[in-house]
């Protein structure tokens, strides 16, 4: 069983036990830091567990070594995965915007294929070691300073748009048809 916890990582542990004292805290292990979201175990190779943290951090956790590797796609559609830090910074730079809980999936057709979204969709066929941007900006690219709140436009210093809110105009979910490889819903 795996799950995310606010401010306290993503963790995995046993779904049950034959021990008379039940499952203990020591039975659980951390697979990713930060704010934990949805860890997804590789459905074929149980060695790997993928997990996300705030603002798009994506990690591949290796159960054999007990170590995680940051695999967040880099900004700008380049191929090498971001290797420094799990979160990789707000939005990833390069004009990219990322949701607080950025979506990702493991393809139901190929367990080494991952999809991850910010305002673009990225694909990896090698468990996140490299990425390719596979879409244009899929959002309306709304500027929060141009959206009325409570019936008016607010000055830049009235609301901390970049300090305490998630980016607007981001992908919030990704799914792939279980019947047709490559048919994606974003």
Predicted region positions:
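Beta-propeller blade termini and top-face loops
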Residues: 1-186
């Amino acid at each position: 069983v795996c799950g995310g916890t606010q401010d306290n990582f993503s963790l995995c542990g046993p779904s049950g036990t034959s021990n008379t004292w039940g499952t203990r805290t020591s039975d659980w292990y951390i697979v990713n830091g930060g704010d934990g979201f949805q860890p997804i175990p590789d459905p074929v190779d149980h060695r790997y567990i993928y997990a996300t943290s705030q603002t798009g951090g994506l990690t591949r956790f290796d159960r054999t070594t007990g170590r995680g590797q940051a695999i967040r796609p880099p900004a700008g559609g380049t191929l090498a995965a971001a290797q420094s830090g799990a979160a990789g910074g707000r939005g990833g730079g390069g004009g990219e915007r990322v949701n607080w809980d950025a979506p990702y999936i493991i393809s139901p057709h190929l367990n080494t294929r991952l999809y991850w979204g910010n305002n673009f969709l990225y694909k990896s066929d090698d468990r996140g070691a490299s990425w390719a941007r596979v879409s244009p900006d899929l959002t309306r690219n709304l500027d929060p300073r141009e959206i009325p709140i409570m019936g008016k436009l607010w000055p830049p210093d009235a609301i901390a748009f970049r300090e305490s809110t998630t980016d607007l105009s981001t992908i919030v979910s990704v799914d792939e048809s279980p019947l047709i490889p490559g048919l994606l819903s974003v």
